[in-house]
Amino acid sequence: MQAFYADHFVLPLPEGHRFPMAKYKLLRDRVVREMTGVEMLQAPAASDGELALAHNPDYIAAITHGTLAASSQREIGFPWSLAMAERARRSVGATVAAARLALGLGSHGQEQRQGVAANMAGGTHHAYAHKGGGFCVFNDVAVAARLMQAEWTRLYRNTRPPLQVAIIDLDVHQGNGTASIFANDASVFTLSVHGARNFPFRKEASDLDVELPDGCQDAAYMEALEHALDELQRRFQPGLVLFLAGADPFEGDRLGRLKLTYDGLEARDRRVFDWAWQRRIPLAFCMAGGYGLNIDETVQVQLNTFRVAFEYWCKWAQMNIL
């Protein structure tokens, strides 16, 4: 299984900043140390043209050239720096590359579908077309969805229907930027399962929003997820799934307000991967949020996601051999 990383582009954050930047390197180290069969690849940087599939040119230029207003930097939560701009491009590029591998779209045409591939960061779902927010600069899943649709159309214009993409966002915070970008796009289905009383406090309308009460535990969460997947299946037929596997519904997360256990989050991940596998839908996933009081707990949740993902990548690999 291929996984794309960009943790070597470290943001120069002020002392005491609440974003746990170290989690990305910690996760990569544990995957390398504890798993075999995962190939680590450096994330490519998304180009201006790729970013423009989901973002306004003026906003892209402001991030690139450091002309972003101080108020906009505060809304994002990161001070501007060259490293911030580069890392944001790499985070998008990682999800694009993972989606391309999962779907089997190579730079020179069709390649064998991997079925499952990973971005070891990403899930920057609070970024709108014209602005960032909530530690999100560019919206990686929005760019990836649009770019995969464009590449699919170029390759299969006269032989297959257009590519439809389902974004399954299980970060504890609503994917407001993603919902806004695809508000009038029937070819992309946005599903968000999130805390009702959590950030963002002014939410957008996804194609399907599932709001959960504070303190929601494993059983209630899984019931809600099952209903959501049934509704997705009833309303939409995706050819690609982009999965935001947020670690922040975990009971030890300081920003999450839900009470899922390790077992509950592993069951959540398994249900999503299995849902896609049973329908033979390629899936690219990213890590999204995770703000554990103990950073090692966040990393453990994410490592468990990788272990489940690898099981389903193996199923795809076996099918490809046969």
Task: Specify the residue positions occupied by each region the protein language model found.
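Acidic carboxylate-rich catalytic motifs and surrounding loops in phosphoryl-/glycosyl-chemistry enzymes
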Residues: 38-48, 284-293
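Glycine-/proline-rich flexible loop or hinge segments
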Residues: 8-13, 45-49, 71-84
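Hydrophobic residues in alpha-helical segments
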Residues: 31, 54, 63-64, 99-109
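N-terminal low-complexity, Ser/Thr- and acidic-residue-enriched intrinsically disordered segments
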Residues: 1-46
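Charged, often glycine-rich, active-site loop that binds/positions anionic groups
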Residues: 46-68
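Short, flexible active-site-adjacent loop segments at beta-strand->alpha-helix junctions, enriched
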Residues: 7-9, 57, 123-124, 194
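A general "terminal functional-core" signal
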Residues: 70-322
